């Protein structure tokens, strides 16, 4: 009778604490990985708290429930359909669609739509919990930001999720209620030396008492900058500028040039009022130990003749390291000198530790739109490997890794009626993922060209230039796996459509990708074998995330919908998972634990009877 009683008790415990044991075992398995993965964050394996999982932007989740062994069995949990919105008061119809990787935190999914809206959705059943919808008709400069309305990131900090709206106002929203608990309005107003316009698709970043933000505006003549504010007082702590003020600045960057790979150049950028660009885009990374902020800067404004901005144009198209407390430049590495091809870095910078010649080195990993991977020492900015080229041979690019031997007076007029490859959108546009000393990089195979036309720029009509994709030739996408220890290519695959803005992620030996046509791919990280592919027949413009609902059940969540880049339909949010009860090897582990518990209980009972 005692044995039967113990057996029943063990089965009851198994049933009651199954979910808890799932979590415990996942955490224990995660601990086993600590010595083997290149970067280990303190983030919960059940949450996806940042756009690329952690503040280092690795895009790697250590969960093991959804794995290479069962990803082929992914099943639909739920779909959330976003509503379309009305045109603005002045009949401007901005594009729709979603470019924001969803966040998953404590059983709630957070996502932003193109219209500056933030939604909180129950991860268990896809039911809406709350939404934040600012009145975008009240925004200033509607004719500017409405062309670039898409949100590209959210950030969770303490008890709030943060969004930066298109006109650069930052809101902190209570995670549970959606109430506004923090507001910092129009952070891109009154930027010194600026005579252009901005829009702001990226959420702020946090470090101690600092809120760090920036805005984009290369196409609208905005001056590149990064700002830090005191979270308590909301006062500006520092500005850092990546380009000189409109009209130029004598000896711009002359003294700071020694901190990077470019020699000082007199009269860099020249002295025209058209000067602009180098705005920081993509995700930034933070190293708390050295208190360093790592970021990427975009190309110089290319709406006017590049010959009017002579020089390397520091600090555009660069990897940049700043002292996070003061905004002081620590080092920079310029990828594309005097950039006229828009060969600036892709979606994000990654901070990680890699092993090179059996020595661990802190490294910054970034890729350019020209299909080069840069592996840079995080402390010094020096190259660990020479720039690593991947993909097809480039065609007709200017100043391709030529640094100080670049043509400092080149003009984009050479591309009028001609093509160059990769295009101004890449190559690499979407974000890579880094896991266990390997970088997984998405690229699109498409060429670009330049047209001349009159356009409005900085409040006047100029004879300017616009960049366009060459879609008369076949296009497709590729994914490359590069060993960061050796710089060697491990494998590559080609898929039918381009990977334009959906970042890659890695988890449990599976690489996840979504192409423009809306095909969801699960790929074996060892050899590039496609383990699963699911067509959704709608624009894929944002990457997936992996996290758990309130019961601890793991799921993959991703948005779909849009047209070209942002799109013309509001989109959906998709949740998929595997049947943990039948597919997961945890059941065998749990049974083993139950059996051990039963044996232990029997032994204890015998000892008590004997005593």
Show which residues each predicted segment covers.
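Sec-dependent signal peptide cleavage junction
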Residues: 35-43
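Aromatic (tryptophan-biased) beta-strands that constitute blades/sheets of beta-rich domains
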Residues: 43-93, 127-143, 179-188, 235-274, ...
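Repeat-blade elements of multi-bladed beta-propeller folds
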Residues: 47-55, 93-117, 143-170, 196-225, ...
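Juxtamembrane/start-of-transmembrane alpha-helix segments at the extracytoplasmic/lumenal side
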Residues: 580-592
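C-terminal membrane-anchoring or membrane-association module
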Residues: 599-611
């Amino acid at each position: 009778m005692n044995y039967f009683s113990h057996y029943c008790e063990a089965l009851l415990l198994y049933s009651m604490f199954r979910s808890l044991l799932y979590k415990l075992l996942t955490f224990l398995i995660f601990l086993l990985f600590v010595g083997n993965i290149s970067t280990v964050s303190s983030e919960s394996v059940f949450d996806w708290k940042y756009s690329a999982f952690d503040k280092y932007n690795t895009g790697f989740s250590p969960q093991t429930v959804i794995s290479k062994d069962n990803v082929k069995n992914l099943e639909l949990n739920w779909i959330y359909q976003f509503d379309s919105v009305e045109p603005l008061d002045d009949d401007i119809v901005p594009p729709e669609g979603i470019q924001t990787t969803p966040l998953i935190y404590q059983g709630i999914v957070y996502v932003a739509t193109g219209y500056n809206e933030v939604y909180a959705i129950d991860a268990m059943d896809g039911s809406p919990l709350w939404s934040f919808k600012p009145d975008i008709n009240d925004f200033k400069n509607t004719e500017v930001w409405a062309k670039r309305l898409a949100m590209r990131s959210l950030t969770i900090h303490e008890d709030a999720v943060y969004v930066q709206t298109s006109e650069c106002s930052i809101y902190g929203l209570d995670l549970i209620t959606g109430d506004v608990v923090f507001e910092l309005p129009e952070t891109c107003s009154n930027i010194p030396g600026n005579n252009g316009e901005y829009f702001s698709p990226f959420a702020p970043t946090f470090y101690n008492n600092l809120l760090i933000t920036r805005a984009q505006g290369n196409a609208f003549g905005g001056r590149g900058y990064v700002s830090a504010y005191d979270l308590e007082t909301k006062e500006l702590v520092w500005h850092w500028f990546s380009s000189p003020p409109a009209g130029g600045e004598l000896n711009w960057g002359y003294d700071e040039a020694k901190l990077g790979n470019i020699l000082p150049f007199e009269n860099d950028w020249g002295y025209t009022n058209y000067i602009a660009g180098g705005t920081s885009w993509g995700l930034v990374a933070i190293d708390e130990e050295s208190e360093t902020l790592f970021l990427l800067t975009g190309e110089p404004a290319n709406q006017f003749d590049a010959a009017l901005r002579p020089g390397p144009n520091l600090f555009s198209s660069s990897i940049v390291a700043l002292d996070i407390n003061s905004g002081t430049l620590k080092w920079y590495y310029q990828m594309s000198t005097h950039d006229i091809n828009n060969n600036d870095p892709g979606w994000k910078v990654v901070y990680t530790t890699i092993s090179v010649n059996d020595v661990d080195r802190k490294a910054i990993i970034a890729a350019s739109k020209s299909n080069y991977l840069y592996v840079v020492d995080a402390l010094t900015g020096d190259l660990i490997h020479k720039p690593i080229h991947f993909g097809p041979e480039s065609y007709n690019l200017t100043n391709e890794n030529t640094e100080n031997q670049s043509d400092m007076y080149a003009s984009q007029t050479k591309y009028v009626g001609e093509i160059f490859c990769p295009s101004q959108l890449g190559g690499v546009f979407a974000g890579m993922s880094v896991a266990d000393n390997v970088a997984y990089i998405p690229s699109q195979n498409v060429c670009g060209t330049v047209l001349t036309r009159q356009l409005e720029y900085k409040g006047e009509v100029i004879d300017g230039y616009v960049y366009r994709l060459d879609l008369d030739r076949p296009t497709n996408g590729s994914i490359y796996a590069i060993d960061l220890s050796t710089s060697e290519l491990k494998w590559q695959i080609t898929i039918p459509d381009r990977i334009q803005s959906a970042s890659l992620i890695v988890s449990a030996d599976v690489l996840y990708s979504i192409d423009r046509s809306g095909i969801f791919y699960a790929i074996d990280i060892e050899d590039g074998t496609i383990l699963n592919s699911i067509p959704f027949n709608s624009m894929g413009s944002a990457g997936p995330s992996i996290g758990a609902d309130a019961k601890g059940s793991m799921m993959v969540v991703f948005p779909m919908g849009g047209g070209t880049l942002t799109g013309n339909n509001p989109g959906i949010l998709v949740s998929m998972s595997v049947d943990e009860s039948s597919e997961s090897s945890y059941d065998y582990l749990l049974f083993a634990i139950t059996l051990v518990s039963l044996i232990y209980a029997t032994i204890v009972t015998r000892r008590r009877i004997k005593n």
